[in-house]
Amino acid sequence: MTDLTPREIVSELDRFIIGQKDAKRAVAVALRNRWRRKQLPDDLRDEVHPKNILMIGPTGVGKTEISRRLAKLARAPFIKVEATKFTEVGYVGRDVEQIVRDLVDTAIVQTREHMREDVKAKAHKAAEDRVLEAIAGTDARESTLEMFRKKLKAGELDDTVIELDIADTSNPMGGMFEIPGQPGANMGMMNLGDLFGKAMGGRTTRKKLTVAESYDVLIGEEADKLLDDETVNKAALEAVEQNGIVFLDEIDKVCARSDARGGDVSREGVQRDLLPLIEGTTVSTKHGPVKTDHILFIASGAFHIAKPSDLLPELQGRLPIRVNLRALSEEDFVRILTETDNALTRQYEALLGTEKVKVTFTKDGIHALAQIAAEVNHTVENIGARRLYTVMERVFEEMSFAAPDRSGEEIIVDEPFVTKNLGELTKSTDLSRYVL
């Protein structure tokens, strides 16, 4: 898991998300507390439970983006799910325990990757031997093998096509046992392909690959041979229990509004099912039981129609840290277009650059784009930073279409260029309502 300090986590998030200081600080402290807990003695460590977070803010202000970036920083088992995908236990659909099962599957892949790194040197040597055997044959002399080994290391044989027996990962048995009417609810049973594969010593298929292509496949295979499945699973389950993070998006969509009448199976029932999961329970998975006591839950929602107080009181109590994210202003849009590492301006420059069209954004052009986005958000519907996608796409619509014919040209995106492509639409509220 990560040992970054809260300040380092916030500065890393600042590269991609503008503003929202409170939300960044809250997730940074929560992430650092995972590390702090690991430093405690065993008896105290079990008593320290994570403080779950509820992020409240309009759409398009960075709630989901914070979760995506956090996943890369955490270096811990992380899963992002939409609360709307789940239904109450007993109804057709996925129940909330599937969240933990999916988290375990993610952790196993992640743990296997880390453990592969530890045995990479041995796996590389074994892969090299298999490639040499395929090139020189099984009964080649030592001197011949050494000659080929030198050529292999020099990269002279990279384009040579060889035939290899590769482990067949396709599953003719149709995968998991499915319960009729409940997709994804495989009850933690073992994959049939795994069962039969292990019983029969694993199936292989003969493939033609170049030497360069074969290396990745063979190193992965040889590393897996050196790894013990039981050790991988045990380490993954422990990582989930101690460091797991679940990001629950769209939590407001499972609120039963205070003025609503009648039952709704996908709303209050889902909240009730989430209670034990967040509080701490044991979930059965195909790799073994998982305790959820120390998994960190971060919930987020726009709460346009429902209010946070419409959540079940017990669920509110289990999400003690509340963070409000503010709506974005015109100044924020300017910063989003200029300061972030993945700015839309850079993306369009790179995309059209592939057609040999040079795109240059001027300061007044960026301000014009930000002003139009903020204006349409204010007059039509506030969808936050996502409005920039729409505005930019409309501005570059003609340019993107004609780019192959204008190779070698330079396009200056200034205020007149933006006004020419968008001006009329922004003046007419009726038009912008449907087009922007």
From Swiss-Prot:
Residues bound to ATP: 18, 60-65, 249, 314, 386
Superkingdom, taxonomy of origin: Bacteria
SUPFAM superfamilies membership: P-loop containing nucleoside triphosphate hydrolases
SMART domains: AAA, ClpB_D2-small
GO-annotated molecular function: ATP binding; ATP hydrolysis activity; peptidase activity; proteasome-activating activity
Subcellular localization, as worded in the UniProt entry: Cytoplasm
One Gene Ontology term, aspect cellular component: HslUV protease complex
Chief place where the protein resides: cytoplasm
Subunit structure: A double ring-shaped homohexamer of HslV is capped on each side by a ring-shaped HslU homohexamer. The assembly of the HslU/HslV complex is dependent on binding of ATP.
Family: Belongs to the ClpX chaperone family. HslU subfamily.
Cited HAMAP family: HslU (MF_00249)
General function of this protein: ATPase subunit of a proteasome-like degradation complex; this subunit has chaperone activity. The binding of ATP and its subsequent hydrolysis by HslU are essential for unfolding of protein substrates subsequently hydrolyzed by HslV. HslU recognizes the N-terminal part of its protein substrates and unfolds these before they are guided to HslV for hydrolysis.
Protein name, UniProt field: ATP-dependent protease ATPase subunit HslU
